[in-house]
Curated annotation (Swiss-Prot):
Binding sites annotated in the UniProt record for heme c: C21, C24, H25, M87
InterPro entries linked to this entry: Cyt_c-like_dom, Cyt_c-like_dom_sf, Cyt_c_1A/1B
Molecular function, one GO term: electron transfer activity
Organism: Komagataella pastoris (Yeast)
Mod. after translation: Binds 1 heme c group covalently per subunit.
Similarity-based family: Belongs to the cytochrome c family.
One of the Pfam families matching this protein, by short name: Cytochrom_C
Predominant cellular place of this UniProt entry's protein: mitochondrion
Gene3D superfamilies on file: Cytochrome c-like domain (1.10.760.10)
Keywords annotated in UniProt: Electron transport, Heme, Iron, Metal-binding, Methylation, Mitochondrion, Respiratory chain, Transport
Residues bearing PTM N6,N6,N6-trimethyllysine: K79
UniProt protein name: Cytochrome c
Underlying gene: CYC1
Length: 110
């Protein structure tokens, strides 16, 4: 069972995003999709629904609503959480890293 989400360091999360996520994702409103979808407005949205992005059927079928907790569960091991996802990222094994990244994303994607 994944660790429960706890608010982390937004600053450390921003650094993690730059080093682990930015090559495939953007966060700003109107930002482009890259290899992965733009993440603006991701919290509260169901998986596989970012307009204009081509998702796998697995992402569309999962139908999870993204919250801090579901994002943490996903980021621990994306391919286990959504088998068939095209996200190549292996995951963040440390709960602290996930908490920091999600704290940043919760702010940066509003």
């Amino acid at each position: 069972m994944p660790a429960p989400f706890e608010k982390g360091s937004e600053k450390k999360g921003a650094t993690l995003f730059k080093t682990r996520c930015l090559q495939c994702h953007t966060v700003e409103a109107g930002g482009p999709h890259k290899v992965g979808p733009n993440l603006h407005g991701v919290f509260g949205r169901k998986s596989g629904l970012a307009e204009g992005y081509s998702y796998t059927d697995a992402n569309k079928r999962k139908g999870v609503e993204w919250s801090e907790q579901t994002m943490s569960d996903y980021l621990e091991n994306p391919k286990k959480y959504i088998p068939g996802t095209k996200m190549a990222f292996g995951g963040l094994k440390k709960a602290k890293d996930r908490n920091d990244l999600i704290t940043y994303l919760a702010s940066a994607t509003k």
